[in-house]
Amino acid sequence: MASLIYRQLLANSYAVDLSDEIQSVGSEKNQRVTVNPGPFAQTGYAPVNWGPGEVNDPTVVQPVLDGPYQPASFDLPVGNWMLLAPTGPGVVVEGTDNSGRWLSVILIEPGVTSETRTYTMFGSSKQVVVSNVSDTKWKFVEMMKTAVDGDYRNGGTLLSDTKLYGMMKYGERLFIYEGETPNVTTKGYIVTNYASVEVRPYSDFYIISRSQESACTEYINNGLPPIQNTRNVVPVAISSRSIKQREEQANEDIIVSKTSLWKEMQYNRDIIIRFKFDNSIIKSGGLGYKWAEISFKAANYQYNYIRDGEEVTAHTTCSVNGVNDFSFNGGSLPTDFAISRYEVIKENSYVYIDYWDDSQAFRNMVYVRSLAANLNDVMCSAGDYSFKLPAGQWPVMKGGAVTLHTAGVTLSTQFTDFVSLNSLRFRFRLAVEEPSFTITRTRVSKLYGLPAANPNGGREYYEVAGRFSLISLVPSNDDYQTPIMNSVTVRQDLERRLNELREEFNNLSQEIAVSQLIDLAMLPLDMFSMFSGIEGTVNAAKSMATNVMRKFKSSKLASSVSMLTNSLSDAASSVSRSSSIRSIGSTASAWANISEQTQDAVSEVATISSQVSQISGKLRLKEITTQTEGMNFDDISAAVLKAKIDRSIQVDQNAFPDVIAEASEKFIRNRAYRVIDGDEAFEAGTDGRFFAYKVETLEEMPFNIGKFADLVTNSPVISAIIDFKTLKNLNDNYGITREQAFNLLRSNPKVLRGFIDQNDPIIKNRIEQLIMQCRL
């Protein structure tokens, strides 16, 4: 029998203990190693103190006093005061438009009587009679001419305690300060070409915006702030204030800060995200009118696009969260169209798109701050999906649409077939759109959302354009790479492959022929015949067997066998010894609302049901440890496992132990077991349903829980491959003899094969249902 594989694994589990002991002895050798972690030894943290990151503030902060700058000829920006701070007498500043006005300002110290002095103005020496009758204030005198070779004449004056002077170009005029501190005023001279007036200061100066003119006037009247008069303030060249005009790049790498070991890099990127949905459509067994599941699943997509003239290779993984489960049942007949479950995403759902490309931004994505993104919206509309029925017109699922709106971005790791990628996860919230979706020839209509049947609508991909920005802490030396904190372990990679393998296994259920399964279930499958078809296991058969037994030893089945005797004894002794009760699932079922039954009877049914469910959960353990001639559920599950392994293209020696252990636990969850006492049969399922009936007539009788408890302790336990409902349905429709009934009750494989060879639809449908329960 095919279930020999499970018995062999249970019987030889001692080999695992020996193997583990050998490995434990070999791993006891220790070595002392001293590691100097250095100054950056904080486990899991970057060598900096992270703050909240940058916080955007719409307020524009403009400095009041910009400077001081060293004397140099430059084009004074329009709308800015130049505040001059000379240290001694002489020419302070010159300004001209080179066409109709030349202005030179000289400074005279206090207490000067009328005298002639020589000044160099605009490159020529000129003698000027000057005087300053004030004993405390310095005097600024404007010397002006209107022709290149003309004579200078005196203009306005400024008497100052602070020895400060101001000049500005604005509104086609050249403005200066006049009067006497602390009550100075401004005056403007009309200049023909004021925007091109060149100013040459001969002293240190400051730049003050016209919007801060009141502050400039305050400085001239009362002097500069104290900090500007310390030795720590050093004038710099005016060229340091110049900002080179350049075209802003949408895709750039900016060094935010840098030390000897680390630097912060800001990466700005324009991106194009292409993604697609994937789905899984599984049909139920039977005549072909039932669908078990239509669901979303993660989809990987790799593509290339051009960014700033450079080809970029990108990879996306699209997944969904918060799906809504719908179902449709057209009736109870085998030929009635039905969908057990189909998924739809709508307003309460989210779509996650993990994005990675081969640019520098994703090279060292470990310590990241200031992560932001801005993406366009995209509308996703479904296409048609036809449910291909064996006969009649096909129902078609049509319509359905949602719009994806960006809702945030975080760091993530996406897994490909060969490598893990540090990536960005873009989260999208959904809004339903027209049209609604319907299933033609059914009552399903005017439902909103995106169903999983054909979510891409025939498109190869959906596309979203946008950009992201982030600041990443990376090594200062570009040749170094930081370790991936969320690196892929062997177990994570195995889990990913197991998920793909589970999906493949579940889809292979429809490819297994029922007649082939019965033959395979009767073969004595052992470990080596089970995995003989797996590539690369012939040379490693010994280690493969050890790995399988080690994994199987920790399974629920193996851990329960050691407690088999006590569990059965305790369960049998704890049941209520009531005389009888009607069968669950009969015409007068306790699951129905029967007015004739009292509340006490219903409570008794519930109690007996829980007790029967508890006992039936132990019956598999007894059956697997006692050999019978009939076929059991483990024969079928092992045969299905072998058939799927032979057809699988993804199973390998690493995943095989997990597959064996998981199959032993999850294949055929809903099982029923029976015991026979003469002409009476007692049948109990793991779902709590129970029946008692006559073998010859298949008439139900009261269920004696006490007798059932005694029988399961002392009699052989038989798998109800053909359960009571199927058996009664077969008898009512076709009629069966007493001998056939006994053989079906004992799960005789030859009789089962005979019914299948005759293409009996009821028996065949029952076996197909068991195959569909063999899911990981």
Swiss-Prot record:
Source domain of life: Viruses
Motif (KID motif): 644-646
Motif (YGL motif): 448-450
Site residues by UniProt (Cleavage): R231, N232, R241, S242
Disulfide bonds: C318-C380
Signal peptide: none
Ranges where the record places region Hydrophobic: 389-409
Renumbered residue ranges of the record's region Spike head: 65-224
Name the UniProt record assigns to this protein: Outer capsid protein VP4
An annotated GO cellular component: membrane
Organism: Rotavirus A (isolate RVA/Cow/Thailand/61A/1988/G10P7[5])
Short sequence motif DGE motif: positions: 308-310
HAMAP family: Rota_A_VP4, Rota_VP4
UniProt region (Spike body and stalk (antigen domain)), positions on chain: 248-479
UniProt keyword terms in alphabetical order: Capsid protein, Coiled coil, Disulfide bond, Hemagglutinin, Host cell membrane, Host cytoplasm, Host cytoskeleton, Host endoplasmic reticulum, Host membrane, Host-virus interaction, Membrane, Outer capsid protein, Viral attachment to host cell, Viral penetration into host cytoplasm, Viral penetration via permeabilization of host membrane, Virion, Virus entry into host cell
